[in-house]
Amino acid sequence: MLPRPLRLLLDTSPPGGVVLSSFRSRDPEEGGGPGGLVVGGGQEEEEEEEEEAPVSVWDEEEDGAVFTVTSRQYRPLDPLVPMPPPRSSRRLRAGTLEALVRHLLDTRTSGTDVSFMSAFLATHRAFTSTPALLGLMADRLEALESHPTDELERTTEVAISVLSTWLASHPEDFGSEAKGQLDRLESFLLQTGYAAGKGVGGGSADLIRNLRSRVDPQAPDLPKPLALPGDPPADPTDVLVFLADHLAEQLTLLDAELFLNLIPSQCLGGLWGHRDRPGHSHLCPSVRATVTQFNKVAGAVVSSVLGATSTGEGPGEVTIRPLRPPQRARLLEKWIRVAEECRLLRNFSSVYAVVSALQSSPIHRLRAAWGEATRDSLRVFSSLCQIFSEEDNYSQSRELLVQEVKLQSPLEPHSKKAPRSGSRGGGVVPYLGTFLKDLVMLDAASKDELENGYINFDKRRKEFAVLSELRRLQNECRGYNLQPDHDIQRWLQGLRPLTEAQSHRVSCEVEPPGSSDPPAPRVLRPTLVISQWTEVLGSVGVPTPLVSCDRPSTGGDEAPTTPAPLLTRLAQHMKWPSVSSLDSALESSPSLHSPADPSHLSPPASSPRPSRGHRRSASCGSPLSGGAEEASGGTGYGGEGSGPGASDCRIIRVQMELGEDGSVYKSILVTSQDKAPSVISRVLKKNNRDSAVASEYELVQLLPGERELTIPASANVFYAMDGASHDFLLRQRRRSSTATPGVTSGPSASGTPPSEGGGGSFPRIKATGRKIARALF
């Protein structure tokens, strides 16, 4: 505090101004600039006092709503000053829909619960519809007609403010289905506004006019497609004609447009998680468009490296262009350069699409082609793979995204390229799968309603935090300044991607299993380890079979000729970084649990070759490195803290046979309290089956080495499951079987006989021992 005489000397302010009473320098790292001025002489002390003020928190229930009340008791520094009253704030935690609408239109909400309106408008589609919400708002306003005029005017002004904010931030909510309720609101607002005579009517008239323009929109002129249906398919190997940076710019242009058109509320777990249910095919169109573009890029990578074009849906309806391994290596290097350019453009969506496609089963098994790739390309590919590692819940990609938003230069530390000019702009396109996973996990971990039926609005606040981050990134995405290249876009539109069966068949024709020379046995080959969170990114209902982890079975066993399978088995305890996918889960995947074959090989640990096949869902087990003749042992799910004991919940992936409809895979959240019957019932409900017949089914865990672990009917699934895998199978009980539940090494879930897989019989173990001895000595 400055002495009083000095303060009087410094008082040069006009009458009514503020006198500088104290000064305190501040650290620029703490914000506030290089220095800080304190006006009034007690602000810094008050801030320190507020931090030490005791806090009391409790819940209050009032008119169908539960509020969380936070009270702070501040103590004055001067003991002679009387104790001020405590400062309290209320946040709505849960309530009925009517109570939420009352709180929304309450004039006190904007001052005490600041984030309520934004969170409510962003997440209301998860628990109600727009017409229902507009109807409740009209009911609330009409109920206040008998109240004093000033209260009605204040509430009407709040309603106009809410509708204006709603229209500005979520215009997509006002479709034709809301027309009836808008007519009702228009009649009330205009009547009340003109009667009040204080300008409310004019504001409401402008608002209704804007709402009408959204309800009856004019059909926009759709751009004409560059590639017409009758045009011949594009040659996927023409990717070599385009410059890598030009192709990356066009991919970024398409991804940025889709991301800007993304409606964040459609990413909510309550909507995205129900998209496959009957009658819900219209849900989340903006998210589906982003997923389709992701799969289109991945399909272009697979088709071009294989040199194949689909001419139909059948496995044999493919046109293959003969390519030698060095030529395929040039295609691999080309796509790696494209991914690097996308990384420089901060287009993480296309980076992940290219990387995941190069890690897919049909591509990463092409050892001859990868062996011809240059060392620099493999180094770049390895660094790109590390960005999307699932370690610590994608911590690397999350931190990198935050850093890239702050930085102006999009260069990687290892990149030798000079910064681009500012002509391309400085936007960012994130990988949407990370946000979808967060929202689906929030939806699975928290209940929609409390025990008394109140809407759990605390859950909606957490979801709103993720949606706000998406909104912020959309604003950053507007920084791009890219021009379309019709030649590249026409080529992308003209590609006809291969189906999963086609891509695997072509890959095996290009390099038959066991025909290519194996890599030198000088490094251990870690097995693939897949995290349990990928299924939450899930399918969109449209099969896109380009990027998956299915492992088709080979015709029979083949004898190894090198020690590589031995080294593979010795290294299976090591964890290899993996990435998840944002692609469609297949409706039918009969080969998911078939034995691993030489087409599903992991790369050496010290080599940046693709680490494993791309997967569409989590917990699909560890693909077994090596040939089908080797039974994989060891741990299939490595890494410290990755077993069931690492947390109190796990996401398991359950396959259910649906007869002629094939197989479907669902993710189920299993907690430490869940018993087998409840898990089986939830799986049946997710597959639209009657949960009353749960007693007729059994839950079987699929373990590495084609082993099975039958979960007893009375067992706790969380503690009974083996940490080596998160793959499960739901099947009808075998009435004629008398075997006790437990681990078996017989046929797998796909019905493969033990002789075709990796059975644990003594003759097979003995034969394997002889192979190991020959390999070592």
UniProtKB/Swiss-Prot annotation:
Keywords of the record: Guanine-nucleotide releasing factor, Phosphoprotein
The N-terminal Ras-GEF domain, residue ranges: 88-212
GO function term, MF aspect, one: guanyl-nucleotide exchange factor activity
Superkingdom in the source lineage: Eukaryota
Ras-associating domain location: 648-735
SMART domains, sorted: RA (SM00314), RasGEF (SM00147), RasGEFN (SM00229)
Any one annotated GO CC term: cytosol
Amino acid composition bias (Low complexity), ranges on this chain: 581-610, 618-632, 740-755
Residue numbers of Phosphoserine PTMs: S13, S409
Biased composition (Gly residues): 31-42, 633-644
GO BP term, pick one: Ras protein signal transduction
Annotated Acidic residues bias: 43-54
Annotated Ras-GEF domain residues: 243-513
CDD domains: RA_RGL2 (cd17211), RasGEF (cd00155), REM (cd06224)
Region (Disordered): 1-54, 581-644, 734-766
Quaternary assembly: Interacts with SAMD9.
Function noted in UniProt: Probable guanine nucleotide exchange factor. Putative effector of Ras and/or Rap. Associates with the GTP-bound form of Rap 1A and H-Ras in vitro.
Name used for this protein in its record: Ral guanine nucleotide dissociation stimulator-like 2
Organism: Homo sapiens (Human)
Gene: RGL2
